[in-house]
Structure formats: C-alpha cells, structure tokens
Amino acid sequence: MYIFHGRVQGIGLRARTYSMAKSLGLSGYIKNRDDGTVEAVFQGDEEKIKRIIEYIKGIAYIEKIDYFDDDVKYNDFQIRY
C-alpha cells in the first residue's frame, strides 16, 4: 500500500490513476483519505508499478510516499470512496 502526501486531492488524481492502472493491467485500488492523503495499492508487473508511480509524480505535487506491505490480492483496479 502506498500513501501519497502532498497536493494529491482535488486534482483528478484518482480518475487519472484509475485509467492508467487499467491500461497497464494492474490490480488494486486508489482512494482519498480523510487526512488529505491518497491511499493506493498496485499489483502486477513490477515495471508497470514503477511506471504508474512515476506517472503519479508527474501529475501531483508529492511531498512524501509511504509504503506498507499489503497481503490482500485484488482481481481488478477500482476507485474506492
């Protein structure tokens, strides 16, 4: 699980990341958190995960990214609310 800190809400990040994740064939989810951060899980090819992280860095002002292991397996990618 990734937690993105910075200017990450109110900029269309979830919708744009959803589209990119679907096009890359990744599974997982993305959602806004109450504290102003964005939480995301990406599962799939490691190079594609690196690519989507770089994509997010290009469309949002990221101050910090935290990473935590997530053992849950996902079958598709979705926006959570």
Swiss-Prot record:
One of its GO terms (molecular function) is acylphosphatase activity. The keyword Hydrolase applies. Coiled coil: none annotated. Gene3D superfamilies: 3.30.70.100. Residues 1-81 form the Acylphosphatase-like domain. It holds the Pfam family Acylphosphatase. It catalyses: an acyl phosphate + H2O = a carboxylate + phosphate + H(+). It is an enzyme of class 3 (hydrolase). Its EC number is 3.6.1.7. Keywords: Hydrolase. The active site is at residues 14, 32. Belongs to the acylphosphatase family. This is Acylphosphatase. It comes from Picrophilus torridus (strain ATCC 700027 / DSM 9790 / JCM 10055 / NBRC 100828 / KAW 2/3).
